Regions:
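Active-site-proximal or metal-binding-adjacent scaffold patches in catalytic folds
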Residues: 1-111, 120-187
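Walker B catalytic acidic pair
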Residues: 116
Length: 187
């Protein structure tokens, strides 16, 4: 899908606004360093070859700053068909922070923003408090991600049983169409 500059700019603003809302929410958390948390870098990368998003600490003029970089071409919202948003295998089945079904592609984009902001606060707190780094998708990450998902993503999601049925039906129809496409036979 080719998007014009103004459409990309609108989606960049969407990402920035939601990341800022998450930043403000984190600043209310009762944990040393949260009040000082500020996303100094919010980047939307539209390069189609960019497949992975990132959140964490970046270096700017020798200073460590929290930030996120979102691989946008993978999450450009399209609407209509049900999709399955996957999370990392270790927690994809988790009912609260795992994968989900939706027919609104803003939902996976919001989940990716929340996921990367969770990494940014995770790494920020490790650096700010001088504590040892833990696992990137360990308990601390999951705790931060769960808080963000509870406020910014999960309340928007459709009924997962119904959407899961719609997704499986859609995938079955698509698979059957691909399998049973008539082929002209030349004798």
């Amino acid at each position: 899908m080719i998007l014009d500059a103004s459409t990309k700019q609108a989606w960049n603003l969407y990402v920035s606004q939601h990341a800022r809302e998450m930043e403000e929410f984190i600043q209310t958390w009762d944990h040393k360093g949260c009040a000082q948390f500020k996303l100094e870098k919010i980047r939307c990368d539209w390069n189609p070859s960019r497949r992975m998003s990132r959140g964490g600490l970046y270096s700017s003029k020798g200073i460590r700053i929290p930030g996120i970089s979102i691989a946008m071409s993978r999450y450009v919202p399209t609407y209509g068909d049900p999709v399955r948003h996957y999370e990392y295998k270790s927690f994809d089945a988790d009912k609260f922070i795992g994968g989900f079904y939706t027919d609104n592609m803003e939902h996976p984009l919001l989940a990716v923003i929340a996921h990367e902001v969770a990494h940014a606060i995770q790494f920020w707190l490790w650096w700010y408090n001088g504590t040892a780094y833990g696992k990137p998708h360990g308990k601390e990450f999951k705790k931060h991600y769960a808080k963000l998902r509870a406020v910014f993503v999960n309340p928007l999601l459709p009924d997962q049983n119904e959407m899961g049925k719609a997704y499986r039906k859609h995938k079955n129809i698509v698979a059957k169409e691909a399998f049973f496409t008539p082929v002209e036979v030349i004798h």
